[in-house]
From Swiss-Prot:
It comes from the Eukaryota. Keywords: ATP-binding, Hydrolase, Membrane, Nucleotide-binding, Nucleotidyltransferase, Repeat, TPR repeat, Transferase, Transmembrane, Transmembrane helix. It comes from Aedes aegypti. One of its GO terms (cellular component) is membrane. This is Protein adenylyltransferase Fic.
Amino acid sequence: MCCVCGEQSPDLKNGLQKQSRSARRSASKKWRYQMNSFHYFVIFASGSLFSGLMFGLLNYAPKYVLLPTRSAPHHLPDGKFLQISDEARVMEPYFPAVRMAGRLGDGNNGSGKIRTEPHDTNEQEALSSLKVAIEMKTMGKDDKAARLFQHALALSPKHPEILTKYGEFLEHNQQDVVRADHYYYQALTVNPSHSEALANRQRTAQIVEHLDQKRFERLDQKRDALSSVSDTNMALKRAEKEAYIQHIYHSVGIEGNTMSLAQTRSILETRMAVDGKSIDEHNEILGLDAAMKYINATLVNKNDFITLKDILEIHRRVLGHVDPIEGGEFRRSQVYVGGHVPPGPGDLSILMNHFESWLNSKQAFLFHPVKYAAMAHYKLVHIHPFSDGNGRTSRLLMNTLLMRAGYPPVIIQKQHRHKYYDYLQVANEGDIRPFVRFIADCTERTLDLYLWATSELSHPVPLLAQETMPDGVPLINSFEKESTIEGSGAGEAIRIGTI
């Protein structure tokens, strides 16, 4: 600064300006640093808050809101399905018959009856037919009434009123209390509060149970009579051999095998191929033969429970010649059997373990042997654990259980395959009793054949396509007459001693 005039020197002025600019730059840097720190803090805090919110939502909010889940259809049965204490009710929620109930109306109207207002042409026609059927019944025209009831039922098979009225007609006009009870049961499956069906079922249930018990007692008497025949009886040995061949013939025939009885016998006795028949049809016969020999050699006299391993060994032999890779193995894909959708492959292991537990439970052992074997057959074929051979394996398991109880292996005729499948479907709809009765009828038919063949006259073993013995005596009266007989050589009697 100049001492005389007081002005700053140029050098000093320039120095002060530089210091001022430096101070401003420092202040600016400090401000930017502070702002950057604040921004970083805000970003960090926001990220932390967002992470905390997401963590809370994922752990406490309903997961079906945030994450789409993949689940199997609810038509699959669970373990409870295999724990049946009352064989008449097979866990209805797993069967299509119960799910169809909602199609009959909108729900219960508070009066104890499901609304059944006609909502399509079929139901309108069914109810009209029902009305006329009741009029014909009142007038004593039972033949016309029966046809009209059946027509109404065909149009609307799950209508509780039609089921109940048809059951009443069967019970009172045709004295068929067993079938009547079945229709009352079906009506209650659709509408558990149907008052008429409830009253009717309370009346018929004990009667039907008594009739079923008498049937089982009759089977035991015939089994005991057959057991009294000496094992060295030559007629018995020949009958067993012939029944063995017929069992294989009918069992593969149920599945569609076109071999005749004579051709089946030729394959089993000579192991030679039959002209004009596929390799698979030959191998189906050989596989069933191998499985039956395994059962006779190991399982019939086994002093232990039947295990899952035993069932797999049976199946391994059933498919041993047809598909050895799949034999004894659970299927690895979903299958569809008519209207029935079996469990998915991922559920088979646990379901089969549950089945094994039921098979060897005290509860199952309390059933009559025929009922026990029939229920085991149904349960296994319903699970459908294999890609092929489920029916043959189920029938073989059934016969294993029967033979362990002193019964001969039961033959289900190929001529009755439609009844066989129909009764399985009825069981799918919730009532297994008709299927058990069907197996009981087949058991009695087989026992009658053995007793006839081992009588003092040493009769021939009739073909199971016949409904009567060679002298006209009926085998049993449980089946309707068949108008046609399948298979070559039908109507002839197989003479004991010719094989």
